[in-house]
């Protein structure tokens, strides 16, 4: 073997050693990072499962889906966004401020309330079995009840299929109706008794500013999710809060059905 050939072998061996050491260091760093991250991921996965049934399967695949969608997460309580929307009508009266701080909500895009829970018997008997059917019954000529297209496990109020949504007179609400697939509102009766519903911009502003709810984390312009008008309503804890939530559901139907009772806000 010549001196040059020997040098070549030494160089190759040196480079191979460097590469092996680099690979070993990378594997070591990955192992350390995984050890540190695993407890957080495990807790986060358990939080995801605790949110109950939704559009994402209750397994690792569903968790991966919500983690990817979380990259598009939007701010949920700002008010300026409402004044940029074209709808200037309002169906809600002035609301009283909700008592106390806002409830803690999940960090996932599957939106749930984590504290300030109402009594389940009260929520099921008064909100699910009484208020929601009562509000929908006032609008049977325009709405019907069916399984939610967002949650898959909840009953929802829908605009009837026979109601046209391409009528120029319905602008700008018809775009919201299209994006929600005619769904107006649903309640998470199998979990925390919160609701999701569509509100006209000025009604959404009133609800958020008075502490009764917040936007969906994927709601906003340019986001692959529900429209900006899609709003999360905190669970009512007593009769007074239930009365406010009933007004909010009524306003949601008014907006989505283009009820002439809407008043333009200057």
UniProtKB/Swiss-Prot annotation:
Query: What cystine linkages occur within this chain?
Result: none
Cited Pfam families: Luciferase (PF17648)
Keyword Cell wall biogenesis/degradation appears in the UniProt entry: no
Q: What is this protein called?
A: Luciferase
E.C. numbers: 1.-.-.-
Taking the first listed entry, what is the main subcellular location of this protein, grouped into a coarse class? Answer: membrane
Please tell me how industry or biotechnology makes use of this protein.
The availability of a complete eukaryotic luciferin biosynthesis pathway provides several applications in biomedicine and bioengineering.
- A GO CC term? membrane
Membrane topology according to the record: Single-pass membrane protein
Instruction: Print the organism lineage.
Output: Eukaryota, Fungi, Dikarya, Basidiomycota, Agaricomycotina
Protein's cellular compartments: Membrane
Superkingdom in the source lineage: Eukaryota
UniProt keyword Transmembrane, yes or no:
yes
Q: Which GO molecular function terms does the record list?
A: oxidoreductase activity
Q: Where are the transmembrane segments?
A: 22-41
Q: What does this protein do?
A: Luciferase; part of the gene cluster that mediates the fungal bioluminescence cycle. Uses the fungal luciferin 3-hydroxyhispidin as a substrate to produce an endoperoxide as a high-energy intermediate with decomposition that yields oxyluciferin (also known as caffeoylpyruvate) and light emission. The fungal bioluminescence cycle begins with the hispidin synthetase that catalyzes the formation of hispidin which is further hydroxylated by the hispidin-3-hydroxylase, yielding the fungal luciferin 3-hydroxyhispidin.
Keywords (A to Z) from UniProt: Membrane, Oxidoreductase, Transmembrane, Transmembrane helix
By sequence similarity, the record places it as follows:
Belongs to the fungal luciferase family.
What is the primary gene name for this protein? luz
**Reactions listed under catalytic activity:** 3-hydroxyhispidin + O2 = (E)-caffeoylpyruvate + hnu + CO2; 3-hydroxyhispidin + O2 = 4-[(E)-2-(3,4-dihydroxyphenyl)ethenyl]-1,7-dihydroxy-2,3,5-trioxabicyclo[2.2.2]oct-7-en-6-one
